[in-house]
Curated annotation (Swiss-Prot):
EC number: 1.8.4.8
Pfam families given in the database record: PAPS_reduct
Keyword Cytoplasm among record annotations: yes
Gene3D superfamilies found in the cross-reference section: HUPs
Function: Catalyzes the formation of sulfite from phosphoadenosine 5'-phosphosulfate (PAPS) using thioredoxin as an electron donor.
Family per similarity comment: Belongs to the PAPS reductase family. CysH subfamily.
Catalytic activity entry: [thioredoxin]-disulfide + sulfite + adenosine 3',5'-bisphosphate + 2 H(+) = [thioredoxin]-dithiol + 3'-phosphoadenylyl sulfate
Record organism: Serratia proteamaculans (strain 568)
Keywords annotated in UniProt: Cytoplasm, Oxidoreductase
Gene Ontology terms describing biological process: hydrogen sulfide biosynthetic process; sulfate assimilation, phosphoadenylyl sulfate reduction by phosphoadenylyl-sulfate reductase (thioredoxin)
One term of GO molecular function: phosphoadenylyl-sulfate reductase (thioredoxin) activity
InterPro entries: PAPS/APS_Rdtase, PAPS_reduct_dom, PAPS_reductase_CysH, Rossmann-like_a/b/a_fold
Name the record gives this protein: Phosphoadenosine 5'-phosphosulfate reductase
C-alpha cells in the first residue's frame, strides 16, 4: 500500500482527502482489525495515540491496539461528570491492560463552568455543543499537540449510529491521520472478542445502558429507543471528538 504525506493531505479539502485515500481504504476494508493496526504502525507517521471514552465496549479496542503496541498513549478527556462506575472501569482497565493512560481536562473546573455558563447541557443543541467544545474538543486538541500525535486510533463502529454508518477505516481529522480498526464490527463480534479474551463490558451494561458518557446526558435504554437517543437527549449523537 502507498505511503502518505500528511502535510499534502492537510492542504486538500475533505473531498480531496477522501479521494486520495480511497484506494487504500478499499484495501484496508479487506484486512482484519489487527492487520489494520499493524499496517498503520508501519505506514503512518508517529507519534501514535489511542483515544477512549471507556464506554460500554471500550475494552475491545484498548486490548486490541495495546496488544500490538503496549506503550501507546491512551487519551481520556475527563469532563468531571462521568459515572462513578466509569471511573472504576478506567482504573480496572488501566491496571489489567497496563495502559499508558494520559488524562486531559478542560482548563476550567466543572464548578467554575457552571458558575460562569450555567448548566450548558440544559441549553439545547447550542449549549451542548459549547459544553462539548470546552470539555471534549479543546482537551483532545491539546492532547494531540502535547503528545505530538500524528496517527490517532479510535474504536468507532458503523453500527453505532447513522452519523458513523459511512465512515472509512482511514481519514484525516484535526490535522492527523485517524484510523478505526474495528469500524466494521457488529455487536456479535464485539461480544465474541470480549469473551475470548476474558474482558468485560462497562459495568452499566448490565443495568440497561447501551452507550455511556456524562451522567447528565446519558439515558438508560428503553424499548423503542435507538442507541443514538440515549445520548444528549436525542438531540445529537457525537460529543464533538469525532466530528470535523
Amino acid at each position: 500500500m502507498a505511503e502518505f504525506n500528511l502535510a499534502e493531505l492537510n492542504a486538500l479539502p475533505k473531498s480531496g482527502q477522501a479521494l486520495s485515500l480511497a484506494v487504500v481504504n478499499g484495501q484496508l476494508e479487506t484486512l482484519s482489525a489487527e492487520q489494520r493496526v499493524e499496517w498503520a504502525l508501519e505506514h503512518l507517521p508517529g507519534e501514535f495515540v489511542l483515544s477512549s471514552s471507556f464506554g460500554i465496549q471500550a475494552a475491545v479496542c484498548l486490548h486490541l491496539v495495546t496488544r500490538i503496541k503496549p506503550d501507546i498513549p491512551v487519551i481520556l478527556t475527563d469532563t468531571g461528570y462521568l459515572f462513578p462506575e466509569t471511573y472504576q472501569f478506567i482504573d480496572q482497565l488501566a491496571d489489567k491492560l497496563k495502559l499508558n493512560l494520559q488524562v486531559f481536562r478542560a482548563e476550567q473546573s466543572p464548578a467554575w463552568q457552571e458558575a460562569r455558563y450555567g448548566k450548558l447541557w440544559e441549553q439545547g443543541v447550542e449549549g451542548i455543543e459549547k459544553y462539548n467544545q470546552i470539555n471534549k474538543v479543546e482537551p483532545m486538541n491539546r492532547a494531540l499537540e502535547t503528545l505530538g500525535g500524528q496517527t490517532w486510533f479510535a474504536g468507532l463502529r458503523r453500527e453505532q449510529s447513522g452519523s458513523r454508518a459511512h465512515l472509512p477505516v482511514l481519514a484525516v481529522q484535526r490535522g492527523v491521520f485517524k484510523i478505526l480498526p474495528i469500524i466494521d464490527w457488529d455487536n456479535r463480534k464485539i461480544y465474541q472478542y470480549l469473551t475470548e479474551h476474558g474482558l468485560s463490558y462497562h459495568p452499566l451494561w448490565e443495568q440497561g445502558y447501551l452507550s455511556v458518557g456524562d451522567t447528565h446526558t446519558t439515558q438508560k435504554w428503553e424499548p423503542g429507543m435507538s442507541e443514538e437517543e440515549t445520548r444528549f437527549f436525542g438531540l445529537k449523537r457525537e460529543c464533538g471528538l469525532h466530528e470535523g
